[in-house]
């Protein structure tokens, strides 16, 4: 596997230079776009990596999966009274659909849905940002994981559209907490700094029927893990979930920091990172690397 990962990275490196980093978040705009890393965490506990797999990056929307798992853990099926699990077919920060559907987000991976999940968690935890950080630390077994306060503040200063979504949902009585407090927590979650190895390990429980092998803790039931994977498969890649299913064939979740996590049920979890994004906001080179990996080892679930 180690040799295969290096071979795949060599094959996709010519694509470096295409795409564009997420400069609409100023703190992310200065990230070097020529970086590329990948890690695979098997259900047997083995870790394989190549390239810049130990370089920290901002996980951004990948954090939405962690928030969702926290909410399911303490509230179960009740969360679906406030949001759905359908693909949106609209931009991840769309307000039009939210207005039309009376403040009920389509799924937990568009921004409005993630804010509802954060609102649910805010009511549950005394210190939501610390609870999230500690949860992620336990999932990956790395107690040095932190949130980048500069990235979080940069996002908070450009919060207008997210704030608009939150206040719109509040007008439909689907947002109960203080908007500014929830936004602060949301951006701290997005600003978690992790590397490919950390993220591959942190998502291992979703490839293992909800069981985190290295900690010995059942994070979700097997059924719940399957449900989370299904939402990742249909809604995890912004407006490119269909293309990702066609090319890679795995449940996945991306972030504008350039990371993509993919789940191989019963087998492994994978994280690839390269900061330059395509037009849909997903890592251009990362998509290509995952496509090659899935094809070489026949990992598609379809």
UniProtKB/Swiss-Prot annotation:
Organism: Pseudomonas syringae pv. tomato (strain ATCC BAA-871 / DC3000)
Similarity annotation: Belongs to the glutaminase family.
InterPro entries: Beta-lactam/transpept-like, Glutaminase
Subunit structure: Homotetramer.
Domain of life: Bacteria
Ligand binding (substrate): 61, 111, 155, 162, 186, 238, 256
GO molecular function annotation: glutaminase activity
Leading EC class: hydrolase
Xref: Gene3D superfamilies: DD-peptidase/beta-lactamase superfamily
Family matches, as HAMAP family: Glutaminase
One Pfam family linked to the record: Glutaminase
Reaction(s) the record says it catalyses: L-glutamine + H2O = L-glutamate + NH4(+)
UniProt keywords, alphabetically: Hydrolase
Full protein name: Glutaminase
GO BP: glutamate biosynthetic process; glutamine catabolic process
């Amino acid at each position: 596997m180690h040799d295969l990962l290096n071979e795949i990275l060599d094959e996709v490196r010519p694509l470096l230079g295409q795409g564009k980093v997420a400069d609409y978040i100023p703190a992310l705009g200065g990230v070097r776009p020529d970086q590329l890393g990948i890690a695979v965490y098997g259900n047997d506990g083995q870790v394989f990596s190549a390239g810049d797999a130990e370089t920290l990056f901002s996980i951004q929307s990948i954090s939405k999966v962690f928030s969702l798992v926290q909410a399911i853990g303490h509230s179960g099926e009740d969360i679906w009274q406030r949001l759905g699990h359908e693909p949106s077919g609209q931009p991840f920060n769309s307000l039009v659909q939210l207005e039309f559907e009376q403040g009920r987000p389509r799924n937990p991976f568009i921004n409005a849905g993630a804010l509802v999940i954060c609102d649910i968690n805010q009511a549950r935890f005394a210190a939501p940002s610390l609870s999230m950080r500690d949860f992620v630390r336990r999932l990956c077994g790395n107690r040095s994981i932190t949130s980048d306060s500069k990235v979080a503040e940069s996002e908070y200063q450009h919060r207008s559209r997210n704030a608009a979504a939150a206040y719109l949902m509040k007008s439909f009585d689907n947002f109960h907490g203080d908007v500014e407090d929830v936004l602060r927590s949301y951006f701290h979650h997005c600003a978690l700094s992790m590397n490919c190895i950390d993220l591959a390990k942190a998502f291992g429980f979703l490839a293992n029927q909800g069981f985190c092998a290295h900690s010995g803790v059942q994070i979700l039931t097997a059924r719940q893990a399957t449900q989370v994977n299904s939402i990742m498969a249909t809604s995890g890649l912004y407006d490119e979930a269909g293309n990702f299913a066609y090319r890679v064939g795995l449940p996945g979740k991306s972030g504008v920091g350039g990371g993509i996590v993919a789940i191989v049920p019963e087998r492994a979890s994978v994280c690839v990172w390269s900061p330059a994004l395509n037009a849909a906001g997903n890592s251009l080179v990362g998509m290509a690397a995952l496509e090659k990996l899935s094809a070489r080892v026949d990992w598609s679930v379809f």
